[in-house]
Amino acid sequence: MKHIVNFLCKRNMLALLVTFFCAGVSTHLYLDWTKSPVKRALEVPFLDLNGNLVEVGDWPADILVLNFWATWCPPCLKEIPLLVEFQKEHPPKKLQVLGIGIDSELKLREFTLGNKVNYPVLIGKSAGIDMAYELGNFSGGLPFTVVIKNKEQIVKQIEGE
């Protein structure tokens, strides 16, 4: 009899835990999916190359140019001088280029210092890959650039060179 009571208690406890877990997951999914992909992307936290935790939405520019890249990607490296020049031509209050590196912190730091990158570079890791997918990079290729206007609307997506 004692074994039956223990079994029923464990079964009820397991059912209760599963219920709470499912309620939590469904609430989390509901909260996430009530926002647009752009709004969700702007809230993703990344480390910058100075070790600060930042979100893409922290930059006040009217236009954000998000460039997903890696140091091992030759087409990515060809784009970077163009992005550096593009940032020089536009004030950061109006337009901000943000590099989201899908690479190690050390490689990103070495590359940006050696190539005089004049815009912020964030350490993307798997969150960067997820964000790129969320913003339309369904193939997973690099480089991938997204232009976001007023933190609300994707106005351009560019895959590859």
Model-derived features with residue positions:
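A short beta-strand-turn-helix
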Residues: E43-L64, A132
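Thiol/disulfide oxidoreductase modules built on the thioredoxin-like
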Residues: L113-N118, G124-E161
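Structural microenvironment flanking redox-active thiols in thiol-disulfide oxidoreductases
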Residues: K78-K116, S126-Y133
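Short active-site neighborhood of thiol/selenol oxidoreductases, capturing the structured segment around
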Residues: E55-P74, L83
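Hydrophobic beta-strand anchors of alpha/beta hydrolase catalytic cores
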Residues: V65-L66, V97, T145
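Active-site acidic short loop of glycosyltransferases
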Residues: W59-D62, P92, N118, G140
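N-terminal targeting signals for export/organelle localization
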Residues: M1-L47
